[in-house]
């Protein structure tokens, strides 16, 4: 190549690089992938049948473009390298019936009865046109025991009650009447576990007959509430359905902890009544069986419930499941119990629980009934083999184990040959298969002495069954040990591979794309973030600005979801987007690159995009070895629920919030009418006045509407003025100002009153204050007649001057007349004359 041609070639390359760089900046060398991926092979191959290996990835997550290196921290994991495989060789297996008991978390539920009397005092005001309730006060008190006996037997009570307030005993009587015996009636409710009985459900709120007075009305209501209560372990208190908490054990009578003093440390009075009679409402008047009841008296009510024994009322354990067919496997230090119904193993020590029947005597009847029912179901195939044993598992469960032995073919043959003979005694447990075969061989030889051909057939069949069972058990034991060892080795292999590429290892383990990295001896795993699939653009060129350096993977521009910023990265394996662009390599003269995205494969030749091919056109490596295990029965793992949802709901809290709130709201809404009366008047108010007036003048048409609007406006204005004045008085500054004004008015009235009294007592002195200090004239003191004449002359002079002023006022025109005359004269052209200063206004001269 000549220097000129070499220079031309170099210039062409430089120009091409500049063109590629400019195109990259303008995003002209990018293209978008399809946003709706289809499974690989859908375009050229038939769909994969179940059981066949698909050529593409199965997880949809691998089809999404994602970023896996954005998170810094994640969940920590480690590999368990100390796992060992148990040795199940030569273990003794025993069939039997298994009963599993769990801890009883359901609270103790029992019936209680609440007694109380409620005195309601209502203050009613009677006005001229309206009545209003101005106050309401309720006073609940417990019912004395003698009256409780009357209420429990006949559903009757007294209409009065005595209340001691601050040392003063007050008596309240219903309807302000005399004390009588009244009946209790059932009151409807919402829930079935609460029943109320009232003697007076209606509040007495009648106003007085004379306007302007207040009346206090009294209502006395006897109340019985039958409901349930709940008490949780350790049963030192209980809660009723209405939310009342009582700090007394429901079993205090049997535990000798009930206090018989008037008041114990909790402020409660506890009393035990023997042979107390309680009848139902439908059976009132009868004589049922008496019972011992506990009565607790608080400051507001009395509670009672039947006395029960704790050992019979509650049991610390409850039956969870019964397994008629289960297997007990003996290990070195423990027993393992398994059953086909569940995919779990119960582990218990080799030592049974001592004194189980004495500690949990409440379970004796239940255990015997359940075991007898299970034995009856297995009577045709199994017989009991030993006594019942009790074990305590490591998880806190109690196991009741009844060993059972299968009726073998020899016993069946003996029963068929001699139906009247009793079944042979059950053999004791055997430890190995060899001992079972030896014992069976001896029994077979003894049975075969009769020379019967059928006996030989039975023994041959039994021997073949034993050989097959031993061989299958041995094969299964070897398979289980080999499988466990393989899992341990796989665990070690995964651990070593994770040192090379933790992300690939954790992605394979999780089955979905994740990001992983080592943080010391642990692995931090984070979720990948899916990007906006429609914003992903893959660059068509793998060239960089440097001549000898090319990208090993194509550049990608994308956006995150709910973001408008454009980011740049590189396309990683399986559609992962790497946030860096440092995966580069030395440029080669001829090379090809294949990058798989979704169901397509991008082909790059000489670091430039060439074409797109179907991913299924690339052959896959078959690394799977098919193993057909269809003849083996599968085990469906099921979630084991130790406690049902009802038990969890009952154990979560002893408060029945649903019943409490429903009953409270229902009981509150029953008094809605009375509450409305407390907020407003009964007979008449402003709105009712306007409404009645509008009904009266409704027939007047437009005039009536105008009258109603004017009346409504006037009433509203007056109400607003009165309300504003009252609010002004309620304000601190307004109140102080009104107090000062009132005090000033009182002082002014007081001063005017004194002045009036002084004028009435000494009018002359009031006019001439220094009249007493003036010396009498030298001519002598005036006589009384002269003084009277002087006073009379002064009075006449004052009357004459007042008459002249009145006449002058009458003769003087009013302001309106003067204004009218002035306007009339101005309209005629007259002007007022100006008077000289030296002319007298009287003479005009």
Swiss-Prot record:
**GO terms for biological process, alphabetical:** symbiont entry into host cell; virion attachment to host cell
Show which residues constitute the signal peptide. 1-26
Keyword Transmembrane helix attached: yes
Q: Which GO terms describe its cellular component?
A: host cell endosome membrane; host cell Golgi membrane; host cell plasma membrane; membrane; viral envelope; virion membrane
Which ranges make up the Virion surface topological domains here? 27-732
Q: Where is the composition biased (Low complexity)?
A: 33-49
Residues annotated as glycosylated are: 179, 254, 275, 355, 368, 372, 385, 408, 455, 562, 599, 614, 628
Q: Which organism is it from?
A: Human herpesvirus 8 type P (isolate GK18) (HHV-8)
Which stretches of this protein does UniProt put in the Intravirion compartment? 754-845
Query: Which cysteines form disulfides?
Result: 68-528, 85-484, 157-222, 315-362, 550-587
According to its UniProt entry, what is the function of this protein?
A: Envelope glycoprotein that forms spikes at the surface of the virion envelope. Participates in viral entry through an RGD motif that binds ITGAV-ITGB3. Membrane fusion is mediated by the fusion machinery composed at least of gB and the heterodimer gH/gL. May be involved in the fusion between the virion envelope and the outer nuclear membrane during virion egress.
Which intervals of the chain are annotated as region Hydrophobic membrane proximal region? 678-730
Q: Which family does it belong to?
A: Belongs to the herpesviridae glycoprotein B family.
Location of the region described as Disordered in the Swiss-Prot/TrEMBL record: 29-57, 411-451, 802-845
User: Whom does it interact with, and what assembly results?
Assistant: Homotrimer; disulfide-linked. Binds to heparan sulfate proteoglycans. Interacts with gH/gL heterodimer. Interacts with host ITGAV-ITGB3; this interaction mediates viral entry.
Give the way it sits in the membrane. Single-pass type I membrane protein
List every stretch annotated Involved in fusion and/or binding to host membrane. 124-130, 208-216
Could you describe the post-translational modifications of this protein? A proteolytic cleavage by host furin generates two subunits that remain linked by disulfide bonds.
What is the protein name stated in its UniProt record?
A: Envelope glycoprotein B
InterPro entries given in the database record: Glycoprot_B_PH1, Glycoprot_B_PH2, Glycoprot_B_PH2_sf, Glycoprotein_B_ecto_C, Herpes_Glycoprot_B
List membrane-spanning regions. Answer: 733-753
């Amino acid at each position: 190549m000549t220097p000129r041609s070499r220079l031309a070639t170099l210039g062409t390359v430089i120009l091409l690089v500049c063109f590629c760089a400019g195109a990259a900046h303008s995003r002209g060398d990018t293209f978008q992938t399809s946003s709706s991926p289809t499974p690989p092979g859908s375009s050229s191959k038939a769909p994969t049948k179940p059981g066949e290996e698909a050529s593409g990835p199965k997880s949809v997550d691998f089809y999404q473009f994602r970023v896996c290196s954005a998170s810094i921290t994640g969940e920590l994991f480690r590999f368990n390298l100390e796992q060992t495989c148990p040795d199940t060789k030569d273990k003794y297996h025993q069939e039997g019936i298994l009963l599993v008991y769990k801890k009883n978390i359901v609270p103790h539920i029992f019936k209680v009865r609440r007694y109380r009397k409620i005195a309601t005092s209502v203050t009613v005001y009677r006005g001229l046109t309206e009545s209003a309730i101005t106050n309401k006060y309720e006073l609940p008190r417990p019912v004395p025991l003698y009256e409780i006996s009357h209420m429990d037997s006949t559903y009757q009570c007294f209409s009065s009650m005595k209340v001691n307030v601050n040392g003063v005993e007050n008596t309240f009587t219903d309807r302000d009447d005399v004390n009588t015996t009244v009946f209790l009636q059932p009151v409807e409710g919402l829930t079935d576990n609460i029943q109320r009985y009232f003697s007076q459900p209606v509040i007495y709120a009648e106003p007085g007959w004379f306007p302007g007075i207040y009346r206090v009305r009294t209502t006395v209501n006897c109340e019985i509430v039958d409901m349930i209560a709940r008490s949780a372990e350790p049963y030192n208190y209980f809660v009723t359905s209405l939310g009342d908490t009582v700090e007394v054990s429901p079993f205090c009578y049997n535990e000798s902890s009930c206090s018989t003093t008037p008041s114990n440390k909790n402020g409660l009075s506890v009393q035990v009544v023997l042979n107390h009679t309680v009848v139902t409402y439908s059976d009132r008047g009868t004589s049922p069986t008496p019972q011992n009841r506990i009565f607790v008296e608080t400051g507001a009510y009395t509670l009672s419930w039947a006395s029960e024994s704790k050992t019979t009322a509650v049991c610390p354990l409850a039956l969870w499941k019964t397994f008629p067919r289960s297997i007990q496997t003996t290990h070195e230090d423990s027993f393992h119990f398994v059953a086909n119904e569940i995919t779990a193993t119960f582990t218990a020590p080799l030592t049974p629980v001592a004194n189980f029947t004495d500690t949990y005597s409440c379970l004796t009847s239940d255990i015997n009934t359940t075991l007898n029912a299970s034995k009856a179901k297995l009577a045709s195939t199994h017989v009991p083999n030993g006594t019942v044993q009790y074990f305590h598992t490591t998880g806190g469960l109690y196991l009741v184990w009844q060993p059972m032995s299968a009726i073998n073919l020899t016993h069946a043959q003996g029963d068929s040959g001699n139906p009247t003979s009793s079944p042979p005694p059950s053999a004791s447990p055997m430890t190995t298969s060899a001992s079972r075969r030896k014992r069976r061989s001896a029994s077979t030889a003894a049975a075969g002495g009769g020379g019967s051909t059928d006996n030989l057939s039975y023994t041959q069949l039994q021997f073949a069954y034993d050989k097959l069972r031993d061989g299958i058990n041995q094969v299964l034991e070897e398979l289980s040990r080999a499988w466990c060892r393989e899992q341990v080795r796989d665990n070690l292999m995964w651990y070593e591979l994770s040192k090379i590429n933790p992300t690939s290892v954790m992605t394979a383990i999780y089955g979905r794309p994740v990001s992983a990295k080592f943080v010391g001896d642990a692995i931090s795993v984070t979720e990948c973030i899916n990007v906006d699939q429609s914003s992903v653009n893959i660059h068509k060129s793998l060239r960089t600005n440097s001549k000898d350096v090319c990208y090993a993977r194509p550049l990608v521009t994308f956006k995150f979801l709910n973001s408008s910023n454009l980011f740049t990265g590189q396309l990683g394996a399986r559609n992962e987007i790497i946030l860096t662009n440092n995966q580069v390599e030395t440029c080669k003269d001829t090379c090809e690159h294949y990058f798989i995205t979704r169901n397509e494969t991008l082909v790059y030749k000489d670091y430039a995009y060439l074409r797109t091919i179907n991913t299924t056109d690339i052959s896959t490596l078959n690394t799977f070895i098919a193993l057909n295990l269809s003849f083996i029965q599968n085990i469906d793992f099921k979630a084991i629920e130790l406690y049902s949802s009802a038990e969890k709901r009952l154990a979560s809290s002893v408060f029945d919030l649903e019943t409490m709130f429903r009953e409270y709201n229902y009981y509150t809404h029953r008094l809605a009418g009375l509450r409305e009366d407390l907020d407003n008047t009964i007979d008449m108010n402003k709105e009712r006045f306007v409404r009645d007036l509008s009904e009266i003048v409704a027939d007047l048409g437009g005039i009536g509407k105008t009258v109603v609007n004017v009346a409504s406006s006037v009433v509203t204005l007056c109400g607003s003025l009165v309300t504003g004045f009252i609010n002004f008085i309620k304000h601190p500054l307004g109140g102080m100002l009104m107090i000062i004004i009132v005090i000033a008015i009182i002082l002014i009235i007081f001063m005017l009153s004194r002045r009036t009294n002084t004028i009435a007592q000494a009018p002359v002195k009031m006019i001439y204050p220094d009249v007493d200090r003036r010396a009498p004239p030298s001519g002598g003191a005036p006589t009384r007649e002269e003084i009277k004449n002087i006073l009379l002359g002064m009075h006449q002079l004052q009357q004459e001057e007042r008459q002249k002023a009145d006449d002058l006022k009458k003769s003087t025109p009013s302001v309106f007349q003067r204004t009218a005359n002035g306007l009339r004269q101005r309209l005629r052209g007259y002007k007022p004359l100006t008077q000289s200063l030296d002319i007298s206004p009287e003479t005009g001269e």
